[in-house]
A protein has these predicted regions:
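A Rossmann-like FAD-binding core segment of flavoenzymes
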Residues: 108-111, 115-123, 188-287, 327, ...
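Glycine-rich flavin
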Residues: 2-4, 20-27, 32-165, 198-202, ...
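Flexible, glycine-rich terminal cap/loop adjacent to redox cofactors
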Residues: 7-14, 18-35, 40, 47, ...
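Glycine-rich dinucleotide-binding loop and its adjacent helix/turn
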Residues: 46, 138-191, 195, 223, ...
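Beta1/beta-strand and adjacent pyrophosphate-binding region of the FAD-binding site
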Residues: 1-12, 165-172
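A conserved FAD-binding loop/helix module that cradles the flavin
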Residues: 212, 299-358, 429, 437-448
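FAD-site-proximal beta/loop scaffold in flavoenzymes
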Residues: 151-166, 249-326
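Short hydrophobic core segments
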Residues: 7-9, 114, 129-139, 171-172, ...
Length: 448
C-alpha cells in the first residue's frame, strides 16, 4: 500500500494546483487521473474554446472590418482542419508541461480511476492508496435532459471533436457555454440558432449588458429564440429536428446541449467514506473546502461553487497553504470574483449586478453610472458595434460594488479593475484616476 500526506482525485486544474502547492511545502503528494491531465478546461473547455474564439476574431477582422481599413480579402477560404490541428497541438504542449511541474514539486501521477474504500483509503486499478488528506476535484460533466431522442444531440465536449464544421447548428441553453459557442460558430460561418427557455440568455448577468448582447446577435444574424422548451428530438432526412413544447420545430445539422453541468461523483463510492451531497447533488463543503468527513475536502466544479477554473486553482492553493504552510485560517474568498464571457463581443464583470445590489443594499442606497458608445475600432467602419459599461456603487462613500462591460477589448480590461474593487475602491478613486486615451477602458474612470 502506498501512503501519502495528500492526494487529489482528479487531474484537472484544481487538483493539479493543490498538489503542486502541497509539494512545494514538502508534502508527499499525488494526483490520480483516469483520463487526460488538465481536465475540462485544458482539453475540452476554456482553452480550445478561447483558441476558437481567436479564430472567430480573426475572421471578423478580415471580412467584417478589414475592407473599411483598406484591406481587401481575395478569398473566403477557411481551413478549419488547420485550425483544429494547431489547437490540438497547443493543448498537447500544455498537457506536457504538467510533468515538469510534478517533477519539480515531487508530485506523483497515478493513472486510473479512484474509488473510496474508507475515509483515508482509495483503490486505483486494484491498488490501495492511503492518505491523511484526500481532495476530491473530479469536476463536472454536461447535463443532457431526459427527453425522447436527447441522445441525438451532442454536448460542448463533442464540439471540439468535430473534424469539420457543420452547415448549421442549434444550441440549447442560456449560459456561458451556449452563448460562447453560438458566437464562435456563427462568426466562423455556421448557420447558428440559439434557443433559451426564458426571455433572454445569461440571466445571472446585468440586464443592461445582456440587452446589448441580444441586440448584437440580431445585428449579426445570429438567431436567438426565447421561451423555447425542447420536448423531443428526432432524426430526419434534413438533419436533427427539435420539437418544442409550444408545437414549433427546428431542424439543424447538429444539435448541442448546453443546459448545465452535473458533478462527477457517481463512481467515487462516496458512501464508503461518509461524504454527503447537497440538495443539488454537489459535494457539500464549508468555507474551508472541508466536507463533513475530517481529512476529506472538495473543490472546483464538483462542489457547484463558482464553476470557473481560476476559482478551483485558487481554492486548491489556499487549501494547501492551510494544511502545509501554517496558515490555519486561510480560506477562499468567493466574493467579487471577476469573470469574462467570451461572447461576440466579450462581456466582463466583477461584483454585484444592479439587481443584486438593490437586494443587498436597498434601492435608496445605491447609485449607478452607465456609458454607451461605439468603440473607435468599429466606429471607422460600416459595422458599428455598441459598447456598454456600468458601475454600481453603494453607500455614502459610493464604494464600487459592481463593474460590468460589453464591447471590444473588455475581456482584457476586467482583471485590473477587479484588483481595485477587491481593495474597496470608491467612485471618487475612479474619478481621481487619469484616463488612458484613446481606449475603451477610459470610460470606467470618466463616467458621471
Amino acid at each position: 500500500m502506498r501512503e501519502y500526506d495528500i492526494i487529489a482525485i482528479g487531474g484537472g486544474s484544481g487538483g493539479i494546483a493543490t498538489m503542486n502547492r502541497a509539494g512545494e511545502h514538502g508534502a508527499k503528494a499525488a494526483v490520480i487521473e483516469e483520463k487526460k491531465l488538465g481536465g475540462t478546461c485544458v482539453n475540452i473547455g476554456c482553452v480550445p474554446k478561447k483558441i476558437m474564439w481567436y479564430g472567430a476574431q480573426i475572421a471578423e477582422s478580415i471580412h467584417k472590418y478589414g475592407p473599411d481599413y483598406g484591406f481587401t480579402s481575395t478569398g473566403n477560404e477557411f481551413d478549419y482542419a488547420r485550425l483544429r490541428k494547431n489547437r490540438e497541438a497547443y493543448i498537447d504542449r500544455a498537457r506536457s508541461s504538467y510533468g515538469g511541474s510534478f517533477k519539480r514539486n515531487g508530485v506523483d501521477l497515478i493513472e486510473g480511476r479512484a474509488e473510496f474504500v474508507d475515509a483515508h483509503t482509495v483503490s486505483v486499478n486494484g491498488e490501495l492508496i492511503r492518505a491523511k488528506h484526500i481532495v476530491i476535484a473530479t469536476g463536472a460533466h454536461p447535463h443532457i435532459p431526459a427527453i425522447p431522442g436527447a441522445e441525438l444531440g451532442g454536448s460542448s465536449d463533442d464540439v471540439f471533436a468535430w473534424e469539420e464544421l457543420p452547415k448549421s447548428v442549434a444550441i440549447l441553453g442560456a449560459g456561458y457555454i451556449a452563448v460562447e459557442l453560438a458566437g464562435v460558430l456563427h462568426t466562423l460561418g455556421v448557420q447558428t440558432d440559439l434557443f433559451v427557455r426564458r426571455d433572454r440568455p445569461l440571466r445571472g448577468f446585468d440586464s443592461y449588458i445582456v440587452e446589448s448582447l441580444v441586440q448584437e446577435m440580431e445585428n449579426t444574424g445570429l438567431n436567438l429564440h426565447t421561451h423555447k422548451v425542447p420536448a423531443k428530438l428526432e432524426e430526419t432526412e434534413q438533419g436533427i429536428t427539435i420539437h418544442f413544447e409550444d408545437g414549433s420545430t427546428h431542424t439543424a445539422s447538429q444539435v448541442i446541449w448546453a443546459t448545465g453541468r452535473r458533478p462527477n461523483v457517481e463512481e467515487l463510492q462516496l458512501e464508503k467514506a461518509g461524504v454527503t451531497l447537497n440538495e443539488r447533488g454537489f459535494i457539500q463543503v464549508d468555507e474551508y473546502q472541508n466536507t463533513i468527513v475530517d481529512g476529506i475536502y472538495a473543490l472546483g466544479d464538483v462542489t457547484g461553487e463558482k464553476e470557473l477554473t481560476p476559482v478551483a486553482i485558487k481554492a486548491g492553493r489556499t487549501l494547501s497553504e492551510r494544511l502545509f504552510n501554517g496558515k490555519t485560517n486561510a480560506k477562499m474568498d468567493y466574493t467579487t470574483i471577476p469573470t469574462v464571457v467570451f461572447s461576440r463581443p466579450a462581456i466582463g464583470t466583477v461584483g454585484l449586478t444592479e439587481e443584486e445590489a438593490i437586494k443587498e443594499y436597498g434601492q435608496e442606497n445605491i447609485k449607478v453610472y452607465t456609458s454607451k458608445f461605439v468603440s473607435m475600432y468599429s466606429a471607422v467602419t460600416s459595422h458599428r458595434q455598441e459598447a456598454r459599461f456600468k458601475l454600481v456603487t453603494a453607500g455614502e462613500n459610493e464604494k464600487v460594488v459592481g463593474l460590468h462591460g460589453i464591447g471590444y477589448g473588455v475581456d482584457e480590461m476586467i482583471q485590473g479593475f477587479a484588483v481595485a474593487i477587491k481593495m474597496g475602491a470608491t467612485k471618487a478613486d475612479f474619478d481621481a484616476t487619469v484616463a488612458i486615451h484613446p481606449t475603451g477602458s477610459e470610460e470606467f474612470v470618466t463616467m458621471r
